[in-house]
């Protein structure tokens, strides 16, 4: 994560970096409204074939790694946003539409296609796996 962040900062030279995290119980609010929320999604595929930890151990390890990463980011010129019962997607949507950032060029870095809907004249989506930008000017398609 830190290596990718460093590379993107070198290439994009941002004025400000905001990282959004899922808050505790982030999807609970949506699940209360729609019990089928996130049903049928494929489990996250790990980038390794050998499983040395149980699923519970992997989750604990993921939480520990995220906590350590957040601690390290506290020493960097990065703004981190997280709120209980709020998903990172909602935070990103709020920030891109916030009057505070009106007139700014905003780049969302994610492989999540749902962010296409946030693309406008000021907001583009960078899909790191494809290494391509998507923008409203091109109908949400990658450039």
Residue ranges, per PLM feature:
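Noncatalytic, basic helical substrate-engagement surface that gates or grips nucleic-acid strands
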Residues: 1-109, 115-134
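A short, charged helix-loop
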Residues: 131-143
